[in-house]
Protein backbone atom coordinates (compact mmCIF):
# COMPACT_ATOMS: atom_id res chain seq x y z
CA UNK A 1 0.00 0.00 0.00
CA UNK A 2 1.17 3.51 -0.80
CA UNK A 3 1.45 5.78 2.21
CA UNK A 4 0.11 8.72 0.23
CA UNK A 5 -3.22 6.83 0.05
CA UNK A 6 -3.30 5.93 3.75
CA UNK A 7 -5.23 7.95 6.32
CA UNK A 8 -2.41 8.33 8.83
CA UNK A 9 -2.63 11.81 10.40
CA UNK A 10 0.48 11.91 12.59
CA UNK A 11 0.94 14.74 15.07
CA UNK A 12 4.13 16.58 15.94
CA UNK A 13 3.03 17.41 19.50
CA UNK A 14 1.50 15.20 22.16
CA UNK A 15 -2.09 16.25 22.98
CA UNK A 16 -2.41 17.70 26.47
CA UNK A 17 -5.26 15.37 27.45
CA UNK A 18 -3.12 12.26 26.94
CA UNK A 19 -1.72 11.20 30.33
CA UNK A 20 -0.10 7.83 29.62
CA UNK A 21 2.39 6.65 27.02
CA UNK A 22 0.04 4.44 25.01
CA UNK A 23 -2.61 7.16 24.72
CA UNK A 24 -0.01 9.72 23.68
CA UNK A 25 1.54 7.52 21.01
CA UNK A 26 -1.69 6.12 19.58
CA UNK A 27 -2.90 9.70 19.11
CA UNK A 28 0.41 11.04 17.85
CA UNK A 29 0.92 8.17 15.39
CA UNK A 30 -2.56 8.55 13.90
CA UNK A 31 -4.05 5.29 15.19
CA UNK A 32 -7.02 6.69 17.11
CA UNK A 33 -8.99 9.89 17.44
CA UNK A 34 -11.46 10.83 20.20
CA UNK A 35 -15.05 11.57 19.22
CA UNK A 36 -16.30 12.13 22.79
CA UNK A 37 -15.01 11.43 26.28
CA UNK A 38 -14.20 7.73 26.42
CA UNK A 39 -15.17 7.10 22.78
CA UNK A 40 -12.68 6.70 19.95
CA UNK A 41 -12.55 6.21 16.22
CA UNK A 42 -10.08 3.54 15.13
CA UNK A 43 -8.20 4.82 12.09
CA UNK A 44 -6.80 2.46 9.43
CA UNK A 45 -3.57 1.55 11.24
CA UNK A 46 -5.43 0.73 14.45
CA UNK A 47 -8.08 -1.24 12.57
CA UNK A 48 -5.38 -3.37 10.97
CA UNK A 49 -3.92 -4.12 14.40
CA UNK A 50 -7.37 -4.97 15.74
CA UNK A 51 -7.99 -7.27 12.79
CA UNK A 52 -4.80 -9.20 13.55
CA UNK A 53 -5.59 -9.45 17.25
CA UNK A 54 -9.05 -10.76 16.39
CA UNK A 55 -7.59 -13.27 13.92
CA UNK A 56 -5.32 -14.69 16.62
CA UNK A 57 -8.26 -14.89 19.02
CA UNK A 58 -10.42 -16.67 16.43
CA UNK A 59 -7.67 -19.18 15.64
CA UNK A 60 -7.26 -20.08 19.30
CA UNK A 61 -11.02 -20.24 19.84
CA UNK A 62 -11.27 -22.62 16.88
CA UNK A 63 -8.72 -24.91 18.56
CA UNK A 64 -11.04 -25.41 21.55
CA UNK A 65 -14.16 -25.79 19.37
CA UNK A 66 -15.73 -22.51 20.42
CA UNK A 67 -18.53 -21.28 18.13
CA UNK A 68 -18.41 -17.68 16.96
CA UNK A 69 -21.73 -15.88 16.69
CA UNK A 70 -23.15 -12.40 17.19
CA UNK A 71 -25.99 -11.07 19.34
CA UNK A 72 -27.43 -7.54 19.50
CA UNK A 73 -25.64 -4.72 21.28
CA UNK A 74 -29.01 -3.20 22.24
CA UNK A 75 -30.76 -5.47 24.73
CA UNK A 76 -34.24 -5.53 26.26
CA UNK A 77 -34.05 -4.53 29.91
CA UNK A 78 -36.38 -7.38 30.84
CA UNK A 79 -33.56 -9.96 30.71
CA UNK A 80 -31.42 -7.92 33.07
CA UNK A 81 -34.38 -7.28 35.33
CA UNK A 82 -34.90 -11.03 35.62
CA UNK A 83 -31.24 -11.64 36.48
CA UNK A 84 -31.27 -8.79 39.00
CA UNK A 85 -28.44 -6.88 37.38
CA UNK A 86 -30.62 -4.10 35.98
CA UNK A 87 -30.65 -2.48 39.41
CA UNK A 88 -27.42 -3.78 40.92
CA UNK A 89 -25.03 -3.12 38.02
CA UNK A 90 -25.04 0.55 38.94
CA UNK A 91 -24.83 3.84 37.03
CA UNK A 92 -22.37 2.43 34.49
CA UNK A 93 -25.29 0.68 32.74
CA UNK A 94 -26.61 2.66 29.77
CA UNK A 95 -30.44 2.66 30.00
CA UNK A 96 -32.96 4.14 27.60
CA UNK A 97 -36.54 3.78 26.32
CA UNK A 98 -37.67 3.28 22.76
CA UNK A 99 -40.63 5.09 21.19
CA UNK A 100 -43.00 2.44 22.55
CA UNK A 101 -41.73 3.30 26.05
CA UNK A 102 -40.01 -0.08 26.47
CA UNK A 103 -36.82 -0.21 28.53
CA UNK A 104 -33.56 -1.15 26.83
CA UNK A 105 -29.87 -1.14 27.67
CA UNK A 106 -26.58 -1.03 25.79
CA UNK A 107 -24.83 -4.28 26.65
CA UNK A 108 -21.72 -4.07 28.85
CA UNK A 109 -21.58 -7.87 28.78
CA UNK A 110 -23.93 -10.58 27.53
CA UNK A 111 -24.40 -13.37 30.09
CA UNK A 112 -28.18 -12.94 30.12
CA UNK A 113 -28.51 -12.89 26.33
CA UNK A 114 -26.53 -16.08 25.76
CA UNK A 115 -28.16 -17.84 28.70
CA UNK A 116 -31.62 -17.10 27.33
CA UNK A 117 -30.55 -18.37 23.91
CA UNK A 118 -29.34 -21.65 25.40
CA UNK A 119 -32.50 -21.92 27.51
CA UNK A 120 -34.57 -21.66 24.33
CA UNK A 121 -32.46 -23.95 22.13
CA UNK A 122 -30.80 -26.65 24.28
CA UNK A 123 -33.00 -29.13 26.16
CA UNK A 124 -30.78 -32.21 26.64
CA UNK A 125 -27.41 -32.82 28.28
CA UNK A 126 -26.41 -34.62 25.08
CA UNK A 127 -26.02 -31.21 23.39
CA UNK A 128 -23.49 -30.15 26.02
CA UNK A 129 -20.77 -29.07 26.65
CA UNK A 130 -20.95 -26.05 24.36
CA UNK A 131 -18.86 -22.88 24.13
CA UNK A 132 -19.94 -19.82 22.13
CA UNK A 133 -18.31 -16.43 21.71
CA UNK A 134 -18.49 -13.12 19.91
CA UNK A 135 -16.25 -10.12 19.22
CA UNK A 136 -18.31 -6.99 19.61
CA UNK A 137 -18.55 -3.45 20.99
CA UNK A 138 -19.57 -3.11 24.64
CA UNK A 139 -20.77 -0.06 26.51
CA UNK A 140 -20.11 1.14 30.03
CA UNK A 141 -20.88 4.66 31.22
CA UNK A 142 -17.62 5.21 33.07
CA UNK A 143 -17.74 8.08 35.52
CA UNK A 144 -14.28 9.21 34.53
CA UNK A 145 -12.93 7.74 31.30
CA UNK A 146 -9.17 8.12 31.11
CA UNK A 147 -5.90 6.73 29.81
CA UNK A 148 -7.05 6.44 26.22
CA UNK A 149 -8.28 2.94 25.42
CA UNK A 150 -7.68 1.67 28.95
CA UNK A 151 -10.90 3.06 30.43
CA UNK A 152 -13.53 3.94 27.85
CA UNK A 153 -17.29 4.14 27.52
CA UNK A 154 -17.31 2.05 24.34
CA UNK A 155 -14.83 -0.78 23.83
CA UNK A 156 -14.33 -3.94 21.81
CA UNK A 157 -14.42 -7.23 23.65
CA UNK A 158 -14.26 -10.93 22.98
CA UNK A 159 -16.79 -12.51 25.31
CA UNK A 160 -17.25 -16.28 25.46
CA UNK A 161 -19.67 -18.44 27.43
CA UNK A 162 -19.47 -22.14 28.22
CA UNK A 163 -22.46 -24.32 29.07
CA UNK A 164 -21.97 -27.69 30.75
CA UNK A 165 -24.18 -30.35 32.28
CA UNK A 166 -21.94 -30.86 35.32
CA UNK A 167 -19.09 -29.35 37.31
CA UNK A 168 -16.51 -31.50 35.53
CA UNK A 169 -17.62 -30.01 32.23
CA UNK A 170 -17.21 -26.48 33.59
CA UNK A 171 -13.76 -27.30 34.98
CA UNK A 172 -12.68 -28.63 31.59
CA UNK A 173 -14.07 -25.60 29.73
CA UNK A 174 -12.35 -23.26 32.20
CA UNK A 175 -9.04 -25.10 31.75
CA UNK A 176 -9.35 -25.07 27.95
CA UNK A 177 -10.08 -21.36 27.92
CA UNK A 178 -7.17 -20.66 30.25
CA UNK A 179 -4.84 -22.48 27.85
CA UNK A 180 -6.33 -20.62 24.88
CA UNK A 181 -5.79 -17.27 26.62
CA UNK A 182 -2.20 -18.21 27.38
CA UNK A 183 -1.65 -19.00 23.70
CA UNK A 184 -3.32 -15.75 22.62
CA UNK A 185 -1.27 -13.50 24.87
CA UNK A 186 1.93 -15.38 24.01
CA UNK A 187 1.26 -14.85 20.31
CA UNK A 188 0.57 -11.16 20.92
CA UNK A 189 4.05 -10.83 22.39
CA UNK A 190 2.76 -9.61 25.74
CA UNK A 191 4.36 -9.98 29.11
CA UNK A 192 1.55 -10.99 31.46
CA UNK A 193 0.60 -12.81 34.64
CA UNK A 194 -2.35 -15.10 35.35
CA UNK A 195 -3.56 -14.00 38.78
CA UNK A 196 -6.34 -14.62 41.29
CA UNK A 197 -9.13 -12.19 40.42
CA UNK A 198 -12.45 -10.90 41.74
CA UNK A 199 -15.67 -11.99 40.04
CA UNK A 200 -17.28 -8.63 40.88
CA UNK A 201 -20.60 -7.87 39.19
CA UNK A 202 -20.29 -11.06 37.14
CA UNK A 203 -21.01 -13.29 40.11
CA UNK A 204 -19.69 -16.82 40.31
CA UNK A 205 -17.38 -18.86 42.50
CA UNK A 206 -13.95 -18.64 40.93
CA UNK A 207 -12.12 -16.32 38.60
CA UNK A 208 -8.68 -15.70 37.15
CA UNK A 209 -7.37 -12.47 35.64
CA UNK A 210 -4.70 -12.00 33.02
CA UNK A 211 -2.75 -8.86 33.81
CA UNK A 212 -0.11 -7.12 31.70
CA UNK A 213 2.46 -5.31 33.87
CA UNK A 214 2.58 -1.64 32.90
CA UNK A 215 3.11 1.68 34.64
CA UNK A 216 -0.26 2.88 33.31
CA UNK A 217 -2.12 -0.07 34.81
CA UNK A 218 -4.90 0.87 37.21
CA UNK A 219 -4.84 -2.51 38.97
CA UNK A 220 -2.38 -3.25 41.76
CA UNK A 221 -0.99 -6.77 41.57
CA UNK A 222 0.45 -8.44 44.67
CA UNK A 223 2.91 -11.21 43.86
CA UNK A 224 5.32 -13.41 45.79
CA UNK A 225 9.01 -12.73 45.24
CA UNK A 226 9.76 -16.43 45.73
CA UNK A 227 6.94 -18.35 44.00
CA UNK A 228 4.41 -17.91 41.19
CA UNK A 229 1.63 -16.68 43.51
CA UNK A 230 0.00 -13.50 42.20
CA UNK A 231 -3.37 -11.89 42.83
CA UNK A 232 -5.22 -8.67 42.31
CA UNK A 233 -4.77 -6.57 45.44
CA UNK A 234 -8.52 -6.88 46.04
CA UNK A 235 -8.15 -10.66 46.37
CA UNK A 236 -4.57 -11.09 47.62
CA UNK A 237 -4.00 -13.00 50.85
CA UNK A 238 -1.08 -12.98 53.24
CA UNK A 239 0.14 -15.88 55.36
CA UNK A 240 -1.34 -15.98 58.85
CA UNK A 241 -1.76 -18.85 61.31
CA UNK A 242 -4.65 -18.50 63.75
CA UNK A 243 -3.72 -18.60 67.42
CA UNK A 244 -5.63 -18.64 70.68
CA UNK A 245 -5.29 -15.71 73.05
CA UNK A 246 -3.46 -16.91 76.18
CA UNK A 247 -2.89 -13.63 78.04
CA UNK A 248 -4.66 -13.06 81.34
CA UNK A 249 -7.80 -11.03 80.72
CA UNK A 250 -7.53 -7.59 82.29
CA UNK A 251 -10.45 -5.53 83.53
CA UNK A 252 -12.36 -3.60 80.88
CA UNK A 253 -11.77 0.12 81.24
CA UNK A 254 -13.26 3.13 79.49
CA UNK A 255 -10.94 6.10 78.98
CA UNK A 256 -11.36 9.61 77.63
CA UNK A 257 -9.84 10.28 74.20
CA UNK A 258 -11.34 13.66 73.23
CA UNK A 259 -8.63 14.67 70.75
CA UNK A 260 -7.75 11.26 69.32
CA UNK A 261 -9.59 10.79 66.02
CA UNK A 262 -7.30 8.36 64.17
CA UNK A 263 -5.74 5.01 64.97
CA UNK A 264 -2.33 6.72 65.05
CA UNK A 265 -3.59 9.22 67.62
CA UNK A 266 -4.96 6.47 69.86
CA UNK A 267 -1.81 4.35 69.50
CA UNK A 268 0.30 7.31 70.59
CA UNK A 269 -1.94 8.10 73.56
CA UNK A 270 -2.04 4.50 74.80
CA UNK A 271 1.59 3.81 73.90
CA UNK A 272 0.52 0.66 72.08
CA UNK A 273 1.48 -0.65 68.65
CA UNK A 274 -1.30 -0.43 66.08
CA UNK A 275 -1.56 -4.20 65.81
CA UNK A 276 -2.84 -4.26 69.42
CA UNK A 277 -5.66 -1.86 68.58
CA UNK A 278 -8.63 -2.42 66.33
CA UNK A 279 -10.43 -0.12 63.94
CA UNK A 280 -14.12 -0.43 63.17
CA UNK A 281 -15.39 0.66 59.76
CA UNK A 282 -19.09 0.90 58.98
CA UNK A 283 -20.58 -0.15 55.64
CA UNK A 284 -24.02 -0.52 54.15
CA UNK A 285 -24.42 -3.88 52.41
CA UNK A 286 -27.72 -4.18 50.53
CA UNK A 287 -29.36 -1.77 53.02
CA UNK A 288 -27.92 -3.58 56.08
CA UNK A 289 -25.47 -1.79 58.39
CA UNK A 290 -22.27 -3.81 58.79
CA UNK A 291 -19.34 -3.15 61.15
CA UNK A 292 -16.00 -4.56 60.01
CA UNK A 293 -13.17 -4.84 62.54
CA UNK A 294 -9.48 -5.15 61.65
CA UNK A 295 -6.28 -4.59 63.55
CA UNK A 296 -5.09 -1.01 63.43
CA UNK A 297 -2.16 -1.76 61.13
CA UNK A 298 -4.35 -3.08 58.27
CA UNK A 299 -6.99 -1.52 56.02
CA UNK A 300 -10.39 -3.10 55.43
CA UNK A 301 -10.67 -4.83 52.06
CA UNK A 302 -14.11 -3.92 50.74
CA UNK A 303 -14.10 -6.55 47.99
CA UNK A 304 -13.45 -9.34 50.48
CA UNK A 305 -16.25 -8.02 52.68
CA UNK A 306 -18.71 -7.81 49.79
CA UNK A 307 -17.82 -11.28 48.55
CA UNK A 308 -18.14 -12.74 52.04
CA UNK A 309 -21.61 -11.25 52.42
CA UNK A 310 -22.61 -12.14 48.83
CA UNK A 311 -23.89 -8.57 48.69
CA UNK A 312 -24.97 -6.91 45.46
CA UNK A 313 -23.70 -3.57 46.76
CA UNK A 314 -21.37 -2.35 49.48
CA UNK A 315 -20.75 1.32 50.28
CA UNK A 316 -19.23 3.23 53.16
CA UNK A 317 -21.93 4.27 55.62
CA UNK A 318 -22.74 7.95 56.04
CA UNK A 319 -21.63 9.32 59.40
CA UNK A 320 -25.11 10.65 60.15
CA UNK A 321 -26.58 7.17 59.68
CA UNK A 322 -23.87 5.63 61.85
CA UNK A 323 -24.43 8.18 64.61
CA UNK A 324 -28.18 7.50 64.53
CA UNK A 325 -27.67 3.73 64.79
CA UNK A 326 -24.71 3.55 67.16
CA UNK A 327 -24.65 6.84 69.03
CA UNK A 328 -21.19 7.97 67.99
CA UNK A 329 -19.38 9.25 64.95
CA UNK A 330 -16.31 8.09 63.07
CA UNK A 331 -13.20 7.88 65.23
CA UNK A 332 -15.00 6.50 68.27
CA UNK A 333 -16.51 3.30 66.88
CA UNK A 334 -15.86 -0.18 68.25
CA UNK A 335 -17.34 -3.66 68.62
CA UNK A 336 -18.52 -3.35 72.25
CA UNK A 337 -22.21 -2.60 72.65
CA UNK A 338 -23.19 -2.49 68.99
CA UNK A 339 -26.96 -2.64 68.37
CA UNK A 340 -28.32 -6.04 67.31
CA UNK A 341 -29.27 -4.71 63.89
CA UNK A 342 -25.60 -4.02 63.09
CA UNK A 343 -23.87 -7.10 61.69
CA UNK A 344 -20.36 -7.59 63.09
CA UNK A 345 -17.55 -9.01 60.92
CA UNK A 346 -14.07 -9.46 62.40
CA UNK A 347 -10.80 -10.03 60.60
CA UNK A 348 -9.02 -13.14 61.84
CA UNK A 349 -6.00 -11.18 63.11
CA UNK A 350 -8.28 -8.96 65.20
CA UNK A 351 -10.22 -12.03 66.39
CA UNK A 352 -7.03 -13.45 67.93
CA UNK A 353 -6.32 -10.37 70.07
CA UNK A 354 -6.71 -10.13 73.84
CA UNK A 355 -6.84 -7.01 75.99
CA UNK A 356 -7.12 -4.78 72.95
CA UNK A 357 -8.37 -1.22 72.57
CA UNK A 358 -11.20 0.14 70.43
CA UNK A 359 -13.70 2.97 70.26
CA UNK A 360 -16.45 2.86 72.89
CA UNK A 361 -19.27 3.95 70.53
CA UNK A 362 -19.34 7.17 72.50
CA UNK A 363 -17.75 10.33 71.14
CA UNK A 364 -14.32 10.97 72.65
CA UNK A 365 -14.19 7.64 74.50
CA UNK A 366 -12.31 4.35 74.01
CA UNK A 367 -12.26 1.00 75.76
CA UNK A 368 -9.02 -0.73 76.71
CA UNK A 369 -8.60 -4.40 77.69
CA UNK A 370 -11.44 -5.64 75.48
CA UNK A 371 -11.71 -9.42 75.21
CA UNK A 372 -13.86 -11.41 72.82
CA UNK A 373 -16.75 -13.44 74.21
CA UNK A 374 -16.43 -11.62 77.51
CA UNK A 375 -17.12 -8.10 76.32
CA UNK A 376 -18.32 -8.87 72.78
CA UNK A 377 -20.00 -12.00 71.44
CA UNK A 378 -18.00 -13.27 68.49
CA UNK A 379 -19.49 -15.84 66.13
CA UNK A 380 -16.93 -18.04 64.38
CA UNK A 381 -18.81 -17.74 61.09
CA UNK A 382 -18.30 -13.97 61.16
CA UNK A 383 -14.50 -14.26 61.33
CA UNK A 384 -12.53 -14.29 58.09
CA UNK A 385 -9.85 -12.46 56.12
CA UNK A 386 -11.19 -8.93 55.66
CA UNK A 387 -7.87 -7.07 55.33
CA UNK A 388 -5.88 -5.61 52.45
CA UNK A 389 -2.39 -7.07 52.24
CA UNK A 390 0.66 -4.83 52.50
CA UNK A 391 3.87 -4.87 50.52
CA UNK A 392 6.39 -6.97 52.43
CA UNK A 393 3.79 -9.23 54.06
CA UNK A 394 4.47 -12.96 53.89
CA UNK A 395 2.69 -14.46 50.86
CA UNK A 396 -0.14 -16.93 51.42
CA UNK A 397 2.13 -19.86 50.49
CA UNK A 398 4.54 -18.82 53.26
CA UNK A 399 7.49 -18.90 50.87
CA UNK A 400 8.05 -15.32 49.82
CA UNK A 401 7.22 -11.72 50.55
CA UNK A 402 4.52 -9.83 48.68
CA UNK A 403 5.63 -7.22 46.18
CA UNK A 404 3.34 -4.79 44.34
CA UNK A 405 3.26 -3.82 40.69
CA UNK A 406 0.80 -2.08 38.38
CA UNK A 407 -1.04 -4.06 35.74
CA UNK A 408 -3.58 -3.74 32.94
CA UNK A 409 -6.37 -6.30 33.02
CA UNK A 410 -6.42 -7.83 29.52
CA UNK A 411 -8.50 -10.93 30.16
CA UNK A 412 -10.72 -12.48 32.81
CA UNK A 413 -12.24 -15.93 33.10
CA UNK A 414 -15.04 -16.84 35.51
CA UNK A 415 -16.75 -19.95 36.79
CA UNK A 416 -20.32 -18.68 36.99
CA UNK A 417 -21.96 -21.92 38.08
CA UNK A 418 -25.76 -21.64 37.96
CA UNK A 419 -25.87 -17.90 38.78
CA UNK A 420 -27.65 -17.07 35.49
CA UNK A 421 -29.06 -20.40 34.34
CA UNK A 422 -31.10 -20.82 37.52
CA UNK A 423 -32.53 -17.30 37.24
CA UNK A 424 -33.26 -17.45 33.52
CA UNK A 425 -34.43 -21.06 33.32
CA UNK A 426 -31.59 -22.63 31.33
CA UNK A 427 -32.15 -26.30 32.14
CA UNK A 428 -31.53 -29.62 30.42
CA UNK A 429 -32.63 -33.18 31.03
CA UNK A 430 -29.72 -35.12 32.56
CA UNK A 431 -28.92 -38.78 31.89
CA UNK A 432 -31.51 -39.77 34.50
CA UNK A 433 -34.24 -37.75 32.83
CA UNK A 434 -34.28 -35.05 35.51
CA UNK A 435 -34.23 -31.31 34.93
CA UNK A 436 -30.93 -29.76 35.96
CA UNK A 437 -29.56 -26.23 35.75
CA UNK A 438 -26.88 -25.68 33.13
CA UNK A 439 -23.48 -24.82 34.64
CA UNK A 440 -21.82 -21.80 33.05
CA UNK A 441 -18.49 -20.09 32.58
CA UNK A 442 -17.81 -16.60 31.22
CA UNK A 443 -14.59 -15.52 29.54
CA UNK A 444 -13.58 -12.05 28.36
CA UNK A 445 -10.69 -10.41 26.52
CA UNK A 446 -10.45 -6.65 26.13
CA UNK A 447 -9.64 -6.49 22.42
CA UNK A 448 -9.37 -2.72 22.04
CA UNK A 449 -7.59 -2.48 25.40
CA UNK A 450 -4.91 -4.79 24.00
CA UNK A 451 -3.80 -1.99 21.64
CA UNK A 452 -2.91 0.10 24.66
CA UNK A 453 -1.42 -2.79 26.63
CA UNK A 454 0.94 -3.72 23.79
CA UNK A 455 1.81 -0.07 23.21
CA UNK A 456 2.57 0.44 26.90
CA UNK A 457 4.94 -2.51 27.00
CA UNK A 458 6.60 -2.24 23.60
CA UNK A 459 7.00 1.47 22.85
CA UNK A 460 10.26 3.39 23.17
CA UNK A 461 11.20 7.07 23.13
CA UNK A 462 10.77 7.24 19.34
CA UNK A 463 7.34 5.68 19.07
CA UNK A 464 5.40 2.44 18.91
CA UNK A 465 7.11 -0.93 18.44
CA UNK A 466 4.62 -3.55 17.27
CA UNK A 467 5.36 -7.28 17.44
CA UNK A 468 5.20 -8.75 13.94
CA UNK A 469 2.13 -10.80 14.90
CA UNK A 470 -0.07 -7.70 15.18
CA UNK A 471 1.77 -4.93 13.30
CA UNK A 472 -0.46 -3.08 10.81
CA UNK A 473 2.08 -3.84 8.07
CA UNK A 474 5.08 -6.16 8.11
CA UNK A 475 7.46 -3.99 6.12
CA UNK A 476 7.90 -0.24 5.72
CA UNK A 477 9.76 0.67 2.52
CA UNK A 478 11.09 4.22 2.71
CA UNK A 479 12.65 5.63 -0.47
CA UNK A 480 14.53 8.82 0.36
CA UNK A 481 13.65 10.47 -2.93
CA UNK A 482 10.89 9.08 -5.14
CA UNK A 483 12.07 11.32 -7.97
CA UNK A 484 15.30 9.32 -8.14
CA UNK A 485 14.74 6.65 -10.79
CA UNK A 486 16.92 4.02 -9.10
CA UNK A 487 15.23 4.54 -5.74
CA UNK A 488 11.77 4.37 -7.28
CA UNK A 489 12.75 1.23 -9.22
CA UNK A 490 14.21 -0.56 -6.20
CA UNK A 491 11.26 0.41 -4.00
CA UNK A 492 8.80 -1.00 -6.52
CA UNK A 493 10.92 -4.13 -7.02
CA UNK A 494 11.06 -4.77 -3.27
CA UNK A 495 7.34 -4.22 -2.86
CA UNK A 496 6.59 -6.74 -5.60
CA UNK A 497 8.99 -9.35 -4.17
CA UNK A 498 7.77 -9.02 -0.60
CA UNK A 499 4.06 -8.96 -1.44
CA UNK A 500 4.60 -12.11 -3.51
CA UNK A 501 5.88 -13.76 -0.33
CA UNK A 502 2.65 -12.89 1.48
CA UNK A 503 4.02 -9.92 3.37
CA UNK A 504 2.07 -6.74 3.98
CA UNK A 505 4.04 -3.75 2.74
CA UNK A 506 3.67 -0.01 3.23
CA UNK A 507 5.63 2.19 0.81
CA UNK A 508 6.31 5.79 1.84
CA UNK A 509 5.87 7.48 -1.53
CA UNK A 510 5.26 10.91 -0.02
CA UNK A 511 7.17 14.00 -1.10
CA UNK A 512 8.62 14.63 2.34
CA UNK A 513 12.10 15.20 3.71
CA UNK A 514 14.02 12.11 4.81
CA UNK A 515 13.90 13.22 8.45
CA UNK A 516 10.12 13.45 8.39
CA UNK A 517 9.82 10.01 6.81
CA UNK A 518 12.17 8.41 9.32
CA UNK A 519 10.43 10.06 12.28
CA UNK A 520 7.02 8.87 11.06
CA UNK A 521 8.38 5.38 10.42
CA UNK A 522 9.71 5.11 13.97
CA UNK A 523 6.49 6.61 15.33
CA UNK A 524 4.08 4.14 13.71
CA UNK A 525 6.34 1.25 14.69
CA UNK A 526 6.32 -1.33 11.87
CA UNK A 527 8.72 -4.24 12.59
CA UNK A 528 11.04 -3.78 9.60
CA UNK A 529 12.01 -0.61 7.74
CA UNK A 530 13.84 -0.81 4.43
CA UNK A 531 15.49 2.46 3.48
CA UNK A 532 16.15 2.92 -0.23
CA UNK A 533 18.79 5.62 -0.54
CA UNK A 534 21.90 6.65 -2.41
CA UNK A 535 23.12 3.08 -2.97
CA UNK A 536 19.98 2.13 -4.87
CA UNK A 537 21.96 2.26 -8.11
CA UNK A 538 24.07 -0.58 -6.65
CA UNK A 539 20.93 -2.50 -5.56
CA UNK A 540 21.93 -1.99 -1.93
CA UNK A 541 19.45 -0.99 0.78
CA UNK A 542 19.46 -0.55 4.56
CA UNK A 543 17.23 -2.76 6.70
CA UNK A 544 16.30 -1.53 10.18
CA UNK A 545 14.80 -3.77 12.86
CA UNK A 546 12.51 -1.48 14.83
CA UNK A 547 12.57 -3.45 18.08
CA UNK A 548 16.35 -3.33 18.43
CA UNK A 549 17.00 -0.22 16.28
CA UNK A 550 19.75 -2.14 14.50
CA UNK A 551 20.60 -1.36 10.87
CA UNK A 552 21.87 -3.87 8.33
CA UNK A 553 23.06 -3.08 4.81
CA UNK A 554 22.24 -5.75 2.23
CA UNK A 555 21.66 -6.35 -1.44
CA UNK A 556 18.13 -6.42 -2.82
CA UNK A 557 18.56 -10.10 -3.71
CA UNK A 558 19.12 -10.89 -0.01
CA UNK A 559 16.20 -8.93 1.34
CA UNK A 560 13.36 -11.47 1.09
CA UNK A 561 15.12 -14.27 2.96
CA UNK A 562 16.70 -11.94 5.50
CA UNK A 563 13.47 -10.08 6.22
CA UNK A 564 11.59 -13.36 6.77
CA UNK A 565 14.08 -14.33 9.46
CA UNK A 566 13.98 -10.87 11.03
CA UNK A 567 10.18 -10.87 11.09
CA UNK A 568 10.09 -14.20 12.88
CA UNK A 569 12.46 -12.76 15.46
CA UNK A 570 10.15 -9.75 15.83
CA UNK A 571 7.11 -11.83 16.79
CA UNK A 572 7.72 -10.90 20.43
UniProtKB/Swiss-Prot annotation:
Belongs to the class-II aminoacyl-tRNA synthetase family. ProS type 1 subfamily. GO terms for cellular component: cytosol. Keywords: Aminoacyl-tRNA synthetase, ATP-binding, Cytoplasm, Ligase, Nucleotide-binding, Protein biosynthesis. GO terms for molecular function: aminoacyl-tRNA deacylase activity; ATP binding; catalytic activity, acting on a protein; proline-tRNA ligase activity; transferase activity. Consists of three domains: the N-terminal catalytic domain, the editing domain and the C-terminal anticodon-binding domain. Transmembrane segments: none annotated. The lineage of its organism: Bacteria, Bacillati, Bacillota, Bacilli, Lactobacillales. Its EC number is 6.1.1.15. This is Proline--tRNA ligase. One of its GO terms (biological process) is prolyl-tRNA aminoacylation. It catalyses: tRNA(Pro) + L-proline + ATP = L-prolyl-tRNA(Pro) + AMP + diphosphate. Pfam families: HGTP_anticodon, tRNA-synt_2b, tRNA_edit. Its main location: cytoplasm. Homodimer. It is found in: Cytoplasm. The keyword Membrane does not apply. NCBIfam families: PRK09194.1 (NF006625), proS_fam_II (TIGR00409). Catalyzes the attachment of proline to tRNA(Pro) in a two-step reaction: proline is first activated by ATP to form Pro-AMP and then transferred to the acceptor end of tRNA(Pro). As ProRS can inadvertently accommodate and process non-cognate amino acids such as alanine and cysteine, to avoid such errors it has two additional distinct editing activities against alanine. One activity is designated as 'pretransfer' editing and involves the tRNA(Pro)-independent hydrolysis of activated Ala-AMP. It comes from Leuconostoc mesenteroides subsp. mesenteroides (strain ATCC 8293 / DSM 20343 / BCRC 11652 / CCM 1803 / JCM 6124 / NCDO 523 / NBRC 100496 / NCIMB 8023 / NCTC 12954 / NRRL B-1118 / 37Y).
